[in-house]
Protein backbone atom coordinates (compact mmCIF):
# COMPACT_ATOMS: atom_id res chain seq x y z
CA UNK A 1 0.00 0.00 0.00
CA UNK A 2 0.98 3.61 -0.43
CA UNK A 3 3.05 4.81 2.51
CA UNK A 4 2.78 8.31 3.92
CA UNK A 5 4.78 10.36 6.39
CA UNK A 6 2.56 13.00 7.95
CA UNK A 7 3.76 16.30 9.35
CA UNK A 8 3.37 20.04 8.98
CA UNK A 9 5.21 21.66 6.04
CA UNK A 10 8.91 21.78 6.83
CA UNK A 11 8.82 18.97 9.41
CA UNK A 12 11.96 16.77 9.12
CA UNK A 13 11.29 13.25 7.85
CA UNK A 14 12.39 11.61 11.09
CA UNK A 15 9.80 13.63 13.05
CA UNK A 16 6.87 12.72 10.81
CA UNK A 17 4.26 10.06 11.58
CA UNK A 18 4.46 7.08 9.19
CA UNK A 19 1.28 5.49 7.83
CA UNK A 20 0.66 2.32 5.83
CA UNK A 21 -3.08 1.66 6.31
CA UNK A 22 -4.57 2.84 9.58
CA UNK A 23 -7.19 4.91 11.37
CA UNK A 24 -5.83 8.25 12.54
CA UNK A 25 -7.20 11.22 14.45
CA UNK A 26 -6.42 14.92 14.61
CA UNK A 27 -7.13 17.39 17.41
CA UNK A 28 -8.26 20.66 15.77
CA UNK A 29 -7.40 22.86 18.76
CA UNK A 30 -4.06 21.38 19.83
CA UNK A 31 -3.13 20.51 16.23
CA UNK A 32 -2.08 17.03 17.29
CA UNK A 33 -1.99 14.15 14.80
CA UNK A 34 -1.74 10.52 15.87
CA UNK A 35 -2.43 7.02 14.62
CA UNK A 36 -5.44 5.59 16.47
CA UNK A 37 -5.10 2.02 15.16
CA UNK A 38 -2.97 0.27 12.54
CA UNK A 39 -3.92 -2.00 9.69
CA UNK A 40 -7.07 -3.04 7.81
CA UNK A 41 -7.32 -2.53 4.06
CA UNK A 42 -8.97 0.42 2.36
CA UNK A 43 -10.96 1.35 5.50
CA UNK A 44 -13.43 3.56 3.66
CA UNK A 45 -16.11 3.59 6.34
CA UNK A 46 -15.76 4.79 9.95
CA UNK A 47 -18.42 5.59 12.54
CA UNK A 48 -19.11 5.22 16.26
CA UNK A 49 -22.18 4.03 18.12
CA UNK A 50 -24.05 5.65 21.00
CA UNK A 51 -21.51 4.26 23.49
CA UNK A 52 -18.51 5.73 21.65
CA UNK A 53 -17.30 2.41 20.23
CA UNK A 54 -15.63 2.82 16.83
CA UNK A 55 -16.15 0.53 13.86
CA UNK A 56 -14.81 0.49 10.34
CA UNK A 57 -15.69 -1.22 7.09
CA UNK A 58 -12.92 -2.48 4.83
CA UNK A 59 -12.76 -3.24 1.15
CA UNK A 60 -11.69 -6.66 -0.26
CA UNK A 61 -10.63 -8.26 3.06
CA UNK A 62 -13.32 -9.27 5.61
CA UNK A 63 -15.44 -6.21 5.96
CA UNK A 64 -16.18 -5.26 9.59
CA UNK A 65 -13.84 -4.35 12.48
CA UNK A 66 -14.24 -3.06 16.04
CA UNK A 67 -11.54 -0.40 16.36
CA UNK A 68 -9.78 0.14 19.69
CA UNK A 69 -6.86 2.49 20.45
CA UNK A 70 -3.51 0.94 19.62
CA UNK A 71 -5.05 -2.05 17.86
CA UNK A 72 -3.29 -3.76 14.96
CA UNK A 73 -5.72 -5.19 12.45
CA UNK A 74 -5.70 -7.66 9.59
CA UNK A 75 -4.01 -6.36 6.47
CA UNK A 76 -4.56 -7.18 2.82
CA UNK A 77 -0.86 -6.85 2.05
CA UNK A 78 2.40 -5.55 3.46
CA UNK A 79 3.70 -5.74 7.00
CA UNK A 80 2.96 -3.91 10.23
CA UNK A 81 5.59 -1.38 11.27
CA UNK A 82 5.98 -3.25 14.55
CA UNK A 83 7.87 -6.48 13.71
CA UNK A 84 6.63 -8.10 16.93
CA UNK A 85 2.98 -8.12 15.85
CA UNK A 86 2.71 -11.90 15.84
CA UNK A 87 -1.04 -11.97 15.27
CA UNK A 88 -3.29 -9.09 14.35
CA UNK A 89 -6.96 -8.53 15.15
CA UNK A 90 -9.45 -10.12 12.77
CA UNK A 91 -12.94 -9.17 11.65
CA UNK A 92 -15.88 -9.29 14.05
CA UNK A 93 -18.24 -10.32 11.23
CA UNK A 94 -19.54 -13.89 11.25
CA UNK A 95 -20.46 -13.68 7.56
CA UNK A 96 -19.58 -12.26 4.16
CA UNK A 97 -21.70 -10.47 1.57
CA UNK A 98 -20.64 -12.75 -1.27
CA UNK A 99 -20.33 -16.45 -2.01
CA UNK A 100 -17.63 -18.45 -3.76
CA UNK A 101 -14.35 -16.88 -4.85
CA UNK A 102 -13.68 -13.14 -4.80
CA UNK A 103 -12.55 -13.27 -8.44
CA UNK A 104 -16.10 -14.22 -9.46
CA UNK A 105 -17.12 -10.63 -8.70
CA UNK A 106 -13.80 -8.81 -9.10
CA UNK A 107 -12.28 -6.82 -11.93
CA UNK A 108 -9.67 -9.49 -12.67
CA UNK A 109 -12.25 -12.26 -13.00
CA UNK A 110 -14.88 -13.03 -15.62
CA UNK A 111 -17.09 -10.14 -14.56
CA UNK A 112 -16.20 -7.57 -17.20
CA UNK A 113 -19.34 -5.56 -17.86
CA UNK A 114 -21.11 -5.62 -14.52
CA UNK A 115 -23.91 -7.68 -13.09
CA UNK A 116 -23.53 -10.55 -10.66
CA UNK A 117 -22.46 -13.93 -11.98
CA UNK A 118 -23.31 -15.73 -8.77
CA UNK A 119 -26.95 -15.85 -7.63
CA UNK A 120 -25.86 -16.76 -4.10
CA UNK A 121 -23.65 -13.67 -3.97
CA UNK A 122 -26.63 -11.56 -5.01
CA UNK A 123 -28.71 -13.03 -2.19
CA UNK A 124 -25.92 -12.48 0.35
CA UNK A 125 -25.35 -8.82 -0.43
CA UNK A 126 -23.67 -8.35 -3.76
CA UNK A 127 -19.89 -8.69 -3.55
CA UNK A 128 -16.66 -8.33 -1.60
CA UNK A 129 -16.03 -4.57 -1.88
CA UNK A 130 -17.59 -2.17 0.65
CA UNK A 131 -17.53 1.57 1.12
CA UNK A 132 -18.76 3.97 3.79
CA UNK A 133 -20.53 3.35 7.10
CA UNK A 134 -23.39 4.96 8.99
CA UNK A 135 -24.51 3.60 12.35
CA UNK A 136 -28.09 4.79 12.64
CA UNK A 137 -28.62 6.81 15.81
CA UNK A 138 -31.24 9.31 14.73
CA UNK A 139 -34.80 10.27 15.69
CA UNK A 140 -36.65 9.56 12.43
CA UNK A 141 -36.42 5.85 11.51
CA UNK A 142 -38.37 3.20 13.47
CA UNK A 143 -36.83 1.90 16.70
CA UNK A 144 -35.64 -1.35 15.12
CA UNK A 145 -33.17 0.63 13.01
CA UNK A 146 -31.31 2.10 15.98
CA UNK A 147 -27.74 0.88 16.03
CA UNK A 148 -27.95 -0.76 12.59
CA UNK A 149 -24.83 -0.55 10.42
CA UNK A 150 -25.63 0.78 6.93
CA UNK A 151 -22.93 0.72 4.25
CA UNK A 152 -22.45 0.30 0.51
CA UNK A 153 -21.72 -2.86 -1.42
CA UNK A 154 -20.09 -1.68 -4.63
CA UNK A 155 -20.46 -4.72 -6.88
CA UNK A 156 -24.00 -5.28 -5.67
CA UNK A 157 -24.95 -1.62 -6.33
CA UNK A 158 -26.84 -1.44 -3.07
CA UNK A 159 -26.72 -0.55 0.61
CA UNK A 160 -26.44 -3.50 2.97
CA UNK A 161 -26.78 -3.75 6.75
CA UNK A 162 -25.14 -5.53 9.66
CA UNK A 163 -26.04 -5.53 13.33
CA UNK A 164 -23.89 -6.33 16.36
CA UNK A 165 -24.20 -7.98 19.74
CA UNK A 166 -21.67 -7.99 22.60
CA UNK A 167 -19.23 -10.88 22.79
CA UNK A 168 -16.55 -10.99 25.50
CA UNK A 169 -14.53 -7.77 25.23
CA UNK A 170 -15.76 -6.95 21.74
CA UNK A 171 -18.74 -7.65 19.47
CA UNK A 172 -19.88 -10.04 16.78
CA UNK A 173 -21.36 -8.64 13.58
CA UNK A 174 -24.36 -10.40 12.03
CA UNK A 175 -25.77 -10.24 8.50
CA UNK A 176 -28.76 -7.92 8.13
CA UNK A 177 -31.15 -7.41 5.25
CA UNK A 178 -30.40 -5.18 2.29
CA UNK A 179 -31.36 -1.57 2.98
CA UNK A 180 -31.58 -0.45 -0.64
CA UNK A 181 -31.08 -2.02 -4.06
CA UNK A 182 -30.56 0.19 -7.09
CA UNK A 183 -31.57 -0.84 -10.59
CA UNK A 184 -28.80 1.31 -12.05
CA UNK A 185 -25.46 -0.44 -12.64
CA UNK A 186 -23.74 2.95 -12.36
CA UNK A 187 -24.92 3.40 -8.76
CA UNK A 188 -22.00 3.35 -6.32
CA UNK A 189 -22.55 4.89 -2.92
CA UNK A 190 -19.31 6.14 -1.36
CA UNK A 191 -20.53 7.83 1.83
CA UNK A 192 -23.52 7.33 4.12
CA UNK A 193 -24.24 9.72 6.99
CA UNK A 194 -27.12 10.33 9.40
CA UNK A 195 -28.15 13.99 9.47
CA UNK A 196 -29.37 16.08 12.41
CA UNK A 197 -32.91 15.56 11.07
CA UNK A 198 -32.58 11.78 11.33
CA UNK A 199 -32.61 11.25 7.57
CA UNK A 200 -29.92 9.16 5.88
CA UNK A 201 -27.77 11.07 3.39
CA UNK A 202 -25.79 9.11 0.79
CA UNK A 203 -23.47 10.02 -2.05
CA UNK A 204 -23.58 8.24 -5.40
CA UNK A 205 -20.34 8.17 -7.41
CA UNK A 206 -22.26 7.34 -10.63
CA UNK A 207 -19.78 5.65 -12.93
CA UNK A 208 -19.82 2.81 -15.44
CA UNK A 209 -16.67 1.26 -14.00
CA UNK A 210 -17.45 -0.36 -10.68
CA UNK A 211 -14.01 -1.05 -9.26
CA UNK A 212 -10.32 -1.05 -10.17
CA UNK A 213 -10.68 -0.59 -13.92
CA UNK A 214 -7.91 1.57 -15.34
CA UNK A 215 -9.89 2.50 -18.44
CA UNK A 216 -10.02 6.32 -18.63
CA UNK A 217 -12.17 6.17 -21.75
CA UNK A 218 -14.97 4.73 -19.61
CA UNK A 219 -14.64 7.08 -16.65
CA UNK A 220 -17.51 9.49 -16.18
CA UNK A 221 -16.71 12.86 -14.64
CA UNK A 222 -20.00 14.61 -15.30
CA UNK A 223 -22.32 12.87 -12.86
CA UNK A 224 -22.53 12.35 -9.14
CA UNK A 225 -25.53 12.53 -6.87
CA UNK A 226 -26.53 13.18 -3.28
CA UNK A 227 -29.66 11.52 -1.89
CA UNK A 228 -31.66 12.07 1.27
CA UNK A 229 -33.62 9.04 2.50
CA UNK A 230 -36.39 9.80 4.97
CA UNK A 231 -38.77 7.46 6.75
CA UNK A 232 -42.42 7.78 5.83
CA UNK A 233 -44.98 5.45 7.50
CA UNK A 234 -46.80 3.14 5.08
CA UNK A 235 -50.21 4.66 5.81
CA UNK A 236 -48.94 8.18 5.19
CA UNK A 237 -47.37 7.10 1.91
CA UNK A 238 -50.57 5.34 0.78
CA UNK A 239 -52.65 8.42 1.53
CA UNK A 240 -50.19 10.60 -0.37
CA UNK A 241 -50.32 8.25 -3.36
CA UNK A 242 -54.12 8.30 -3.31
CA UNK A 243 -54.18 12.09 -3.32
CA UNK A 244 -51.25 12.27 -5.75
CA UNK A 245 -49.33 14.42 -3.30
CA UNK A 246 -45.89 14.27 -1.79
CA UNK A 247 -45.88 12.46 1.58
CA UNK A 248 -45.56 14.59 4.68
CA UNK A 249 -43.08 12.32 6.41
CA UNK A 250 -40.09 14.65 6.32
CA UNK A 251 -39.93 17.46 8.85
CA UNK A 252 -36.85 19.71 8.69
CA UNK A 253 -35.01 20.20 11.95
CA UNK A 254 -35.66 23.62 13.42
CA UNK A 255 -32.64 25.94 13.52
CA UNK A 256 -30.72 25.73 16.76
CA UNK A 257 -27.79 27.44 18.44
CA UNK A 258 -26.26 25.43 21.27
CA UNK A 259 -24.29 28.47 22.44
CA UNK A 260 -27.58 30.05 23.52
CA UNK A 261 -28.80 27.05 25.52
CA UNK A 262 -28.78 26.99 29.31
CA UNK A 263 -26.50 24.64 31.22
CA UNK A 264 -29.53 22.56 32.19
CA UNK A 265 -30.66 22.15 28.58
CA UNK A 266 -27.14 21.29 27.44
CA UNK A 267 -26.89 18.64 30.15
CA UNK A 268 -30.17 17.11 29.01
CA UNK A 269 -29.01 17.07 25.39
CA UNK A 270 -25.73 15.46 26.42
CA UNK A 271 -27.37 12.45 28.05
CA UNK A 272 -30.23 11.84 25.61
CA UNK A 273 -29.69 8.99 23.18
CA UNK A 274 -32.27 9.69 20.49
CA UNK A 275 -30.13 11.96 18.32
CA UNK A 276 -26.37 11.42 18.10
CA UNK A 277 -25.84 15.00 16.92
CA UNK A 278 -26.60 16.45 20.37
Give the positions of each predicted feature.
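Beta-propeller blade termini and top-face loops
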Residues: 1-268, 274-278
Amino acid sequence: FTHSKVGKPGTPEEERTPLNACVWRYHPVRHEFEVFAHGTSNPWGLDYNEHGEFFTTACVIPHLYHIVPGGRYQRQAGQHFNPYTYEDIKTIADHAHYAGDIKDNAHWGPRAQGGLNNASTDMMGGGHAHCGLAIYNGPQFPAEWRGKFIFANLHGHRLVTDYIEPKASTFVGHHGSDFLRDNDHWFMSVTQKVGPDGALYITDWQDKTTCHRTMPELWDQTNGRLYRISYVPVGVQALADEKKQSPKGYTPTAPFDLAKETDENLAQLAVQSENAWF
